[in-house]
Design a protein with these regions (language model features):
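Residues that cap or initiate secondary-structure elements
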Residues: 17, 26, 46-48, 70, ...
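Short beta-strand and beta-hairpin "edge-sheet" elements
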Residues: 22, 67-97
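Solvent-exposed edge beta-strands and adjacent loop segments
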Residues: 1-34
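Beta-strand secondary-structure signal
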Residues: 39-41, 63-65, 88-90
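Short, ordered beta-strand-loop transition motifs
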Residues: 28-36, 80-87
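Signature of dsDNA virion morphogenesis modules
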Residues: 2-5, 45-47, 79
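Short conserved beta-strand and strand-loop elements enriched in small hydrophobics
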Residues: 5-14, 55-69
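Charged, amphipathic alpha-helical segments
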Residues: 35-53, 98-99
């Protein structure tokens, strides 16, 4: 498992693009038994209405673009899982994440 701090993260959903505001985020890449999966953990989100919106819908698919703290760009698609109580979210990857 490899973890990368995320400096910037933008999600695209329902024809809109939103740069996420948070206190900490990390990209996690899990490689096990010949397969890879990835997800992004996001903590301290200040966009409460965005968390609420995703909590109220079953349309949670997003495209995302990000930059790790060391400047590596990444893009992929995934599913946005909000945690309103803790002002947090997780994006579970739905496709390969090129370059990782």
């Amino acid at each position: 498992m490899n973890t990368y701090p995320v400096a910037e993260l933008t999600i695209n959903y329902d024809g809109m693009s939103t740069r996420l505001m948070y206190t900490a985020a990390q990209l996690v890449i899990v490689s096990d038994a010949g397969y890879k999966l990835w997800y992004v953990e996001i903590d301290g989100m200040t966009q409460h209405s965005l968390l609420h919106m995703f909590n109220q819908t079953d349309q949670i698919g997003v495209a995302l673009d990000g930059v790790t703290a060391d400047g590596k760009h990444f893009s992929g698609t995934g599913f946005f899982h909000p945690n309103e109580q803790h002002y947090a979210a997780a994006i579970r990857g739905d496709s390969e994440l090129p370059g990782f």
